[in-house]
Amino acid sequence: MEKYKDKQLSAYERAAALADTLSTEEQAQQLKYDAPAIEKAGLSSYNWWNEGLHGVARAGTATGFPQAIALAAAFDKDMMYRVGEVISTEARAMYNSAAKHGDTDIYKGLTLWAPNINIFRDPRWGRGHETYGEDPYPTSRLGVKFVEGIQGDGPVMKAAACAKHYAVHSGPESLRHEFDAQASMKDMWETYLPAFEALVTEADVEAVMGAYNRTNGEPCCAHKYLMEDVLRGKWKFEGHYTSDCWAIRDFHEHHMVTSTPRQSAAMALNAGC
């Protein structure tokens, strides 16, 4: 029996064994959000893109909860846990139903790009309704319970949550692909990082999504301090780091830190994205 099929091994060991059987081209294909099937291993294609900020209604009928900013206004941690439970239950049901029919299209997977724990500092920001407000403390407390509800506490993760957008991503929306957010270390650690730290160290969130913008001069999807020193170094994050949609393209088209798509991809991969 191939090592990657041995259920006595950990998921990490099986994934590593499978990766060892793939060519460089096959491995690269798996980095796309719409990863193709690996037929020789009997694995179907998988689409990593699913949303779950306040429901999973993009793939059929589902419970639509109020926007995140409205949920947060209740200041109810237990409610946030229950909301997360419902969302992941419905996501799991949709996934199971789709899988029976070989449907691996967008919004059918178990990787939910939620919650958005950015700090809603400026009310003119167009995505503030996705957040839990302007205060890092309730954002942290509510975010932890939401992630715990999404991921569950069973031997197999119910669905995977993703803390986004790391970090200092709170507008201006029209410039998100090119602006450079300048934040002092004091502001970073008092305002913008506490919620991410809580979700990683307390809730064991499975994924973190990098923001489009730069923070203090470096793209958030290839940021040594944020990704290597803080996330994986200080907080010991062991999950996967994903870019926001097509954010790597911004490296050479807007941030001008690289010249070609190949250079941008290499920069992101070498940084751990």
Predicted regions span which residues?
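Glycoside hydrolase catalytic-domain context in secreted enzymes
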Residues: 1-273
